């Protein structure tokens, strides 16, 4: 089987969104993004078009890999094979050279997330040198909003990024890092002057992307109170399936339900 890799530089956001949807056909969690949402989502996550890749067999689409980068760390933000090519051991053949090229370009650490019940995917990534870091969850707020006093104040989104970025320093999952907020459509809300939340409107329902409580006010219930206020304010508010599982008590105490889906965060040192 002669497979040809081509850099994503050769394609538009419309084409890449189409390729991604085709390659995720039949997956337990299908991916379908409009060109605009593709560009906004992966642009915010730091897509590297030069490193992202589309594979072909002749004129037939085989697979796609979306790579995002920050300095010497890269992430496999999305990877999928067309249904006809699955179960044939192709992925390792495609990804190993891709990761080696990243190493040659100065990448020292690779990150990814994989659905927790995708045993084949987990086995593949372990064979490629990845190790599990933690379990990631998603949380769903109330499906209808409740009226009441508006205790949230709009603030300059950059205030939150400035406050949080230095403290976070790569300790959060990639999608929740405040650096991923900069080019997303989002608003930041302040609660009681010492707690902040970023809510994105990229998708059809609002998404809670980040919360931050000033260090000296932590342990006083600010985060739980703010989460409660937020899901009463925004109907259908949810998080990405990217929140470390250790935060489950905080979300459940604030009235959120835990989504059924889980992901594993994995990392490899090159």
Question: Could you tell me what each predicted segment is?
Answer:
Residues 2-18, 148-164:
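A short beta-loop-alpha structural element at the N-terminal edge
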Residues 18, 29-53, 57-66, 165-190:
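Active-site rim helix/loop that mediates acceptor-substrate recognition in acyltransferases
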Residues 69, 82-84, 88, 116-117, ...:
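Active-site acidic-Proline motif in GNAT/NAT acetyltransferases
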Residues 108, 115-117, 137-162, 260-270:
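C-terminal "cap" of GNAT-fold acetyltransferases
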Residues 81, 87-100, 123-127, 219-232:
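Conserved acetyl-CoA-binding loop-helix of GNAT-fold acetyltransferases
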């Amino acid at each position: 089987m002669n497979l040809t890799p081509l850099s994503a530089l050769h394609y538009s956001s419309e084409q890449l969104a189409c390729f991604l949807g085709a390659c995720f056909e039949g997956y337990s969690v299908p991916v379908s993004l409009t060109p605009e949402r593709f560009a906004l989502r992966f642009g915010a996550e730091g897509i590297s078009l030069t490193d992202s890749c589309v594979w072909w067999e002749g004129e037939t689409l085989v697979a796609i890999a979306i790579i995002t980068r920050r300095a010497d760390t890269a992430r496999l933000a999305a990877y999928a094979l067309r249904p006809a090519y699955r179960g044939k051991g192709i992925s390792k053949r495609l990804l190993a050279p891709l990761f080696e090229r990243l190493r040659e370009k100065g990448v020292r650490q690779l990150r990814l997330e994989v659905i927790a019940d995708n045993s084949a995917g987990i086995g593949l990534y372990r064979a490629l040198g990845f190790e599990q870091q933690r379990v990631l969850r998603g949380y769903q707020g109330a499906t209808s909003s409740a009226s009441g006093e508006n205790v949230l104040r709009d603030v300059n989104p950059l205030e939150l990024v400035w406050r949080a970025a230095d403290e976070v320093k790569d300790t959060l999952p990639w999608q929740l890092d405040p650096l991923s907020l900069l080019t997303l459509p989002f608003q930041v809300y302040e609660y009681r002057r010492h707690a902040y939340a970023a809510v994105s409107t990229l998708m059809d329902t609002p998404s809670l992307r980040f919360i931050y409580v000033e260090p000296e006010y932590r342990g006083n219930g600010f985060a739980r109170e703010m989460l409660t206020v937020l899901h009463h304010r925004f109907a259908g508010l949810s998080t990405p399936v990217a929140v470390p599982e250790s935060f489950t008590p905080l979300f459940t105490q604030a009235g959120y339900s835990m989504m059924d889906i889980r992901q594993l965060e994995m990392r490899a040192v090159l």
